[in-house]
């Protein structure tokens, strides 16, 4: 099913709900009276979202320090395991690679996901656990914890930790123990970056493609769903004095990454205030995947929006309807670069807790975004945005442990909680 078809199905599923902000192609034809009017309409939302985005951005110096730290891990492996330096390549994955890494509202450390790609010798091909354990031996002397697919490396007195995933080029282990070619699982266009990682639970190699996922998000982010004429007019006025965007700072016109960041922040604030259970919160890769699918789908359907908050509301309205459930597989959120990988695998083993939490959070998210959208003036828009996303008057980038002036902890007034159900329909 294409992204457009997924979005159309989501529209149909929520058709009985309240009217959407921008739900007809005809809306695209409404003429704006002038650039001044366009700028006036867009500017307050652009300012408010830019303020929030800057507040949740992690300081560039902390990102630089973390990047140096994972390169040091690679050097440690070369030294301890006597692997050729040219055989190891380390690069970020997850939020750090998609530029959607954000600071935590509760002063906890931020995590950097890094992939350690190693060109292995033949002895490791049939012994993935030995490869994984040897990487662990190479990290001896550090504070490490073995997880299912990575080594968690903690750094005392630093605002981050690193989840270090050993991997190999898929080409080197592409035939599994049953004689199946793992390369057939890789989506067309992403084979060059495909990897195999160790799955300790099954004691096998599993296909992965973090760089492919980054490429997929990058391609989607090029679509502009907020009307171009408004965006250009507003940005010329709002962004004149903004300094060049660094690695983890994104401009307000990058509406896909802004959406991912803000939705992740809202999820974190919902956990922080106790509105949803941390154990069952939607994981970041699910939010990235669903939002990017919707973004592609809306672009393919020709949807455009008058301002960024309207786009966010539309995404929030569609979000709970983007997770299909099948009689055979249960809930399924597929990796767009690796066929068969289900990011929602744990949704099918928790008696509906994650699906139920997701549905509840989506309702809270939509309510809060509509609260911002309903504001009548710039001051109120900013105040509501600050409250929803837990921002203080300190709006600059900060460290992952909260930094700055902390966060607002007074909970936003909420609608009545949704009734308990068996999960998403």
Where are these regions (language model features)?
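N-terminal regions immediately upstream of nucleotidyltransferase
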Residues: 1-109, 120-130, 152, 405-407, ...
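Conserved nucleotidyltransferase catalytic core and NTase-mimicking acidic/glycine-rich helix/loop elements
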Residues: 241-367, 371
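Long, charge-rich alpha-helical interaction segments
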Residues: 193-257, 262
